[in-house]
Amino acid sequence: IVCDKSVKIAGDVFTNDIIYYMRTQHNLFVGETTAEKVKIQIGAATEDLDSPPEDMAVDGRDLLTGKPKRVDVSYREIAKALDKSIQRIEDAVMETLSQTPPELSADIYNTGIYLAGGGSMLRGLDKRISMKTDLPVYIAEDPLRAVVRGTGMTLKNINKYKGILIK
């Protein structure tokens, strides 16, 4: 690991962003399970998607009346709800790139950036980071297991990587 920047943003943060958005913009109280479904079905990192998902009916409790309520929500709304958290990810990427040694910067310029983890599967995140960095951005093959597999390979070959893992 040549340089790194850690940001405490994961799928749970996106889920909480959706819960907050539904409460403040629609006066609708939704639970984690519902917010997670919204994130998976229509979650987006940008309003500019090539093939956007259909609007989604979201059920919850009306905060004003206490009655059950249904609201139609678009992916554009969810992109707005997630915007601040995604900006934090973009800032971390830009900070990391600014600290990257020149030789590695050349490699990144030629090969691009690879995203891993569940958050990388958010629609348009690769496109948004690419627009911010002016670099190609790809989603890793099997993004949910990529980090674990990479860590496992490194641990199996610890002597090979020891020199670059210790700061």
Regions found by a protein language model. Give the residues of each.
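Phosphate/ATP-binding catalytic cores across multiple sugar-kinase/actin-like superfamilies
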Residues: 81-108, 154-157
